[in-house]
Amino acid sequence: EIIGGRFFYNPQDCRGRSVLDSGYRHEVRHEISIASPNHPIAHGLPDTFELTDELYLCEVFEDAIDPLLRSDHDFVREKFYSAHHAVTGNLYCNDNWYPDEGSAILGWTRQHKNSRIVYLQPGDNTATFGNANYRQLLANAIRWAAHRQ
């Protein structure tokens, strides 16, 4: 709850309902749009930018977060693989796995007690870390979370 979402490797209960394991997909080229352009974390960023990175089909608690980033990727079963299948040795499989459609929100902020929380899903590969927009995003997020903005 503190982070604002969860990734599961096995089916289980989440916030009072049964959910399947989460999904993943490596090396997805997608466009990210800034959902909150006036937020300090968005300072200096274009309205949209492209990344190629891993994406996750997981639980996002949209009622408890302030969206910051959205992807144009479709967060549906056909575009992801089952995390449970992966950890049991079947890496690129979604057989008999029928999760609900997921959230396209890739980054968000929230407050927990006196702490600022920021979650950024991108950051799985060197290409992402080498992207100037991602580096600006990450620097802004660190400053914001540390109350330096």
What are these regions (language model features)?
Residues E1-A83, V87:
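An acidic, glycine-rich "communication" segment
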Residues D74-Q149:
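Extracellular ligand-binding/catalytic regions of CAZymes and related secreted enzymes
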